[in-house]
Curated annotation (Swiss-Prot):
Zn(2+) binds at H153. Pfam families: Rota_Capsid_VP6. The keyword Transmembrane does not apply. The keyword Ubl conjugation applies. This is Intermediate capsid protein VP6. It comes from Rotavirus A (isolate RVA/Human/United States/WI61/1983/G9P1A[8]) (RV-A). It is found in: Virion.
């Protein structure tokens, strides 16, 4: 993997800097590195593809070295370099696609394609120029079963989940009380509602709670907490739990009371915030517990009083909600990130070349299913294919 990264970094620099008119002295070190790459690769043969519709391609390396010059690089010099660069980039692209198409239930973090396994040989260690990539560093740690640490912005840690629970239900669905939620990506939105606006509740207060267990622990998380759940702020028709009928939800938004968010790790409370909104920090957690209250307003103007009558029918439904959004966090496991294209790149390659479903990844790289059942085997394979995708992205946009 380190050799693949060094090849890609060298080729990227060469493509960007070996241009007509450049002083040789400005790129002499790069050209020496480029020549070392050629010397090491010459005389070797590789094969890529042969899985799904990814065609088999054979690669032979027999290139001349780039010479020295006292002056600027001329058109002939650059053209010679370009021919070599383009062949190497095509090779790297195919090695990466071949690797992203493969998976293994055992030691999935190790190279799976024939070409990348060959590049891992001792003879290619002379190409190992640069390992500054965060993904390479973490791949090395994961490969040695040591602690990794990825910094994510908007990590896709929550499997998609959208549902409701009813704490009070009537056959006609005309006087309901409960919670509804939408968890997805890096965001939780949860709403508590009571058609009667806590009319007969103790002290006219309804208590709501929403607990979310993460598939992997996060640390050093920057989080935004808001006293609103905008996705549940408009009318909708909702299918009943048994699918036999539908019920109408027509929310009137109130501000939640006594809001508390707890971050737990292995059942122990690590951080607690009460009635604090905006930016909050969570040190280390694998579970989030949100609790909040709906309080019937003790004093109401006639207009508000008309919204919340003392008896049925209840045309409008009192609703309070919260939004919790993880803006950035550190995780010991590789995850999809809303700010990165790695999952999209891997999925696109596997779809384009009709890669058959293997023993590890779900069909279509379905992220909700993948993260819901995030096994060590999936973690290892994701670590590898995301590392390869990050390398490929240096050369192929």
């Amino acid at each position: 993997m380190e050799v693949l990264y060094s090849l890609s970094k060298t080729l990227k620099d060469a493509r960007d800097k070996i241009i007509e008119g450049t002083l040789y002295s400005n790129v002499s070190d790069l050209i020496q590195q480029f020549n070392q790459m050629i010397v090491t690769m010459n005389g070797n043969d590789f094969q890529t593809g042969g899985i799904g519709n990814l065609p088999i391609r054979n690669w032979t390396f027999d290139f001349g070295l780039l010479g020295t010059t006292l002056l600027n690089l001329d058109a002939n010099y650059v053209e010679t370099a370009r021919t070599t660069i383009e062949y190497f980039i095509d090779f790297i692209d195919n090695v990466c696609m071949d690797e992203m198409a493969r998976e293994s239930q055992r030691n999935g973090v190790a190279p799976q394609s024939e070409a990348l396994r060959k590049l891992a040989g001792i003879k290619f260690k002379r190409i190992n120029f640069n390992n500054s990539s965060e993904y390479i560093e973490n791949w090395n740690l994961q490969n040695r079963r040591q602690r990794t640490g990825f910094v994510f912005h908007k990590p896709n840690i929550f499997p998609y989940s959208a549902s409701f629970t009813l704490n009070r239900s009537q056959p006609m669905h005309d006087n309901l009380m409960g919670t509804m939620w939408l968890n997805a990506g890096s965001e939780i939105q949860v709403a508590g509602f009571d058609y009667s606006c806590a009319l007969n509740a103790p002290a006219n207060i309804q208590q709501f709670e929403h607990i979310v267990q993460l598939r992997r622990a996060l640390t050093t998380a920057t989080i935004t907490l808001l006293p609103d759940a905008e996705r549940f702020s408009f009318p909708r028709v909702i299918n009943s739990a048994d699918g036999a009928t539908t019920w109408f939800f027509n929310p009137i938004i109130l501000r939640p009371n006594n809001v508390e968010v707890e971050f737990l790790l292995n059942g122990q409370i690590i951080n607690t915030y009460q009635a604090r909104f905006g930016t909050i920090i969570a040190r280390n957690f694998d579970t989030i517990r949100l609790s909040f209250q709906l309080m019937r307003p003790p004093n109401m103007t006639p207009a508000v009083n008309a919204l919340f009558p003392q008896a049925q029918p209840f045309q409008y439904h009192a609703t309070v909600g919260l939004t919790l959004r993880i803006e950035s966090a550190v995780c010991e496991s590789v995850l999809a990130d809303a700010n990165e294209t790695l999952l999209a790149n891997v999925t696109a390659v596997r779809q384009e070349y009709a890669i058959p479903v293997g023993p590890v990844f779900p069909p279509g790289m379905n992220w909700t299913e993948l993260i819901t059942n995030y096994s060590p085997s999936r973690e290892d394979n994701l670590q590898r294919v995301f590392t390869v995708a990050s390398i490929r992205s240096m050369l192929i946009k």
